Amino acid sequence: MHSYKCDNEVENVAEANLYRDIFPYTEIPKVVFDNKNIPMNMPKDVWITDTTFRDGQQSMSPFTVEQILTIFDYLHKLDNGSGIIRQSEFFLYTEKDREAVEKCIERGYEFPQITAWIRANKEDFKLVKNMNIKETGILMSCSDYHIFKKLNLTRQQAMEKYLEIAEEALANGIIPRCHLEDITRADYFGFVVPLVRRLMELSAKANMPVKIRACDTLGLGVCHDGAALPRSVKQIMHGFTHYCNVPSEWIEWHGHNDFYSVVPNSTTAWLYGCAGISSTLLGIGERTGNCPLEAMIVEYGQLKGSIKNMDLTVLTDIATLFEKDLGYQIPHKTPFVGSDFNVTKAGIHADGILKDEEIYNIFDTGKILNRPVVVAVNEYSGLAGIAAWINTFFRLTDDKKINKRDPRVITVKEWVDEQYADGRTSVIGNDELEKIVKLTFEELSDDKKVEVIDYKVCKSKRGTFRSVQDKNLETSKR
């Protein structure tokens, strides 16, 4: 690793360093390589923090107090005493915000711990003191884009402003969590390192933690080997521990998904010295969103080999809550929570699932997420797809499983084929298939009065099946 001369004084430049060779604005940003070899340094204990009520909520219609409390309860159930979901971050600006925080505090949960977020001014700080919250995030924009263009300050003025509010927090016994906004466009050794070193001095003087949150505001971070600053996630993390002596448990990464890199960047931050990853449920957030909390839970399990006693079935409850109560449409193919994330439509895959669902399912989604693997039926499904749908929908196992060679499966397939021959273009709905299958398979019918189809007749005479269908069902051709 190249050795840099680090001191506690900012490089107080007259003009903003906008890294135009990397961020030309009228072109796609560039990735520059300096081929520095950064050693992996994953902390023994890592965790996830939640900013659904702060950064996430900014992108949606405001949550009600009751909705915030319900989501907070779900976060607690999801964590299940493991401490993996360590903290949850809240706004304090409106009466509604403060009421929600008070109700969450009344729950008395150990996890997630409740923290706040404020701008770098003393008036905001009074809100934290009045709520008796032990830790608060403080906005500390660190790129020249923000310091010069947004705040209209010099680097020295910005540093003095940030140190003053951090010192105020420490003097009142509140842990400051310094949000270094836009760090992936910042002059790392000209501003970030001097600021963080000064913050560590304040920490030592007060004998209290001063936490550092690295905020990849525009999702510009990259995790490639040999990538250079300011975009290198590895070098940012390494610099905190190596040049600034920040303990890993005081470091947090907050990413955005503008370049589809939020999950690999967050995982890289863990691997190179960061203990905490900031996230939101379902990845909600500004523009392309934040790091999905559910993604980092699975990353945690893969890296650590265990999710302790977390209850991941709660993720399915959370997805239902967001869609039904909050009106948020989760993209169908979203991993772990989307309606189609473990749905198979290809006939050849359905045949594999029919033999053993492990062939085409990522893990036991039924056990872990309460989301059994599903086979959707369309014009390409074939006998295997229909048999697999029957087995998964009705939870049939072992000797109760329906074989694709069962003649009654052919009966159902004939009905499916008719739908598409008549111009249908959509997948057959579960409710439609359920009715057809119960009519065809007597042992699966919960209504013994239902007319059971003689599949031997139907196999040779489609019209017989159609008359039974018309008599017993109301099907839609969507």
Regions flagged by a language model, labelled:
Residues I48-T51, R86-F90, P112-I118, T136-I138, ...:
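Hydrophobic faces of well-ordered beta-strands that scaffold small-molecule active sites
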Residues R107-F111, N130-E135, M208, T268-G276:
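Glycine-enriched alpha-helix->loop->beta-strand junction motifs that scaffold or abut catalytic
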Residues R54, F91-E95, W117-N121, S141-S143, ...:
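Active-site beta-loop-alpha junctions enriched in small/polar residues
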Residues L92-W117, N121-L127:
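N-terminal active-site wall of soluble small-molecule enzyme domains
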